[in-house]
Amino acid sequence: MKVMKDNTKIYSSRQEHLVAKLVDGTVVAGSGARDLHPGDVRNNEFLIECKTHMALTDRIEFFADVWDKISSEAESRLKFPALVVDNGTQTLEGSWVLTRIGAIQIANCKMFECPCKISVNLKFSHDQFLKITNMLHQKFNTPIAYVIPFNPQSLVLLTLKDFVEVRFK
């Protein structure tokens, strides 16, 4: 089973280093050792949890329990929580971010109600949602954010690219 865990760590590490570079942050040493080192990436304002896949997938899913955990860990450190999930590519283009609405500069983006169905978790087709988002980018020429009522909070969903543009540029 060690081989599988090592392979998983390679994909996770690739994603974590990409996110850290984009948000001017650092990869948390020993990330995965939850109690001692919460989150995977941190900077001055955010504690970020990263989730990826070992194979390409069209399904993006944000799990409520993962959001609750990173949210609680971030609050205890006076940081904003963010959850990054990708489609297995560990790339900017394949990644989505869930964070609190107060964590982004809403004046720097166009806000829409999220068309996703939400039960306990937030899940959607990466390809379909990216197509809609790209059409909105072309129409409004600005970053796009989707407002989501999730675990009685107002959250926003953005592509990783839009998150970086709205928050870090």
Ranges and model annotations:
Residues M1-Q15, M111, P115-N121, Q128-I132, ...:
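Interdomain/boundary linker segments immediately adjacent to catalytic/signaling cores
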Residues K2-E75:
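Catalytic centers of nucleases
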Residues T8, H37, R42, G88-T89, ...:
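Intrinsic disorder/low-complexity detector
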Residues H17, F46, T52-Y146:
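Catalytic cores of nucleic-acid endonucleases
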Residues D40, S95-W96, L155-V156:
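A residue-level structural signature of the nucleotidyltransferase/glycosyltransferase Rossmann-like core
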Residues N141-K169:
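Charged phosphate-binding loop/patch that engages nucleotide di/tri-phosphates or the phosphate backbone
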